[in-house]
Amino acid sequence: MAGRSFTFVSGAGSPLSGHLEPPEGTPRGWAIFAHCCTCGKDSRAAVHISRALSRAGIGVLRFDFAGTGIGGGTGEPVNFASDVEDLRAAANAMAAAGMSPSLLVGHSLGGTAAIVAAADMPDIAAVATIGAPADLQHILRLFGPNDLDTIASEGEASVEIAGRPFLIRRGFLEAVEGIDVEKAIASLRRPVLVMHSPLDQVVGIDHASRIFVASRHPKSFISLDNADHLLTDVADANYAAAMVAVWASRFLPPLSADLPQVEVAEGVVSTETLAGTFQLKVRSGEH
């Protein structure tokens, strides 16, 4: 089924731009994908993982947090607390549209936000993180040498992260000090999947260890061998997507046996699998 736009209002009252990836037939569940700090809803990881979940029967909303992407939040200050509220607002908007989510998937800081947000989202059955930091102090290491002084003296600063400017205000630093991520993980008591590359140069593998240890069972860990933090290699993005889809299927209702039949085109139909170069799915009639 073709994707479509989905705009909703953030906790702060700003419109946020989203994209729905519905599955064919009756969804077995709905998920929200939270992008990384320097990404957006159309990043490679966001797109591939959303589409993989859709093929597994799980509909997905990926959206731009306030301050990123093309949504109405563009130009607003980056604020971890608002990211958490944006996730909750997205879930409420989906529920109002008859698509109540039961899965959160977060990449990098989006994974940390998903963990914190899920604590107050009882309908969320499971949380998956990809390259997520185990504490918010980690992001301060990405700031320039004078950024913290500027924020302290002027209340805000334009901070360059991964080549992009982000408006950071004093409230962000207060959130960094005030949120205990590992405590939030320990109190979550929901299935957690931790995915991380041992070669991650942005968020070290030790963060994955801390998240995994703090999580309660059932919990799972998958190593993203040779992947970089942003999953820029399409093969790494596809692998992560496939693993999330398989893992999530254990915590959602089974695929319905009476799914609507997809109209079969005459002749031979080939479609890209998105699993790598030269890989096609070929269908001839009903075969």
Predicted regions and their residues:
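Hydrolase active-site cap/lid region
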Residues: 122-171
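N-terminal cap/lid segment of alpha/beta-hydrolase-fold proteins
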Residues: 1-26
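Short beta-strand/loop motif that positions the catalytic acidic residue
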Residues: 188-189, 194-196, 200
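Extended beta-strand/beta-hairpin segments
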Residues: 247-287
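Catalytic histidine-centered segment of alpha/beta-hydrolase-like enzymes
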Residues: 227-239
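The serine-hydrolase catalytic nucleophile loop
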Residues: 37-50, 65
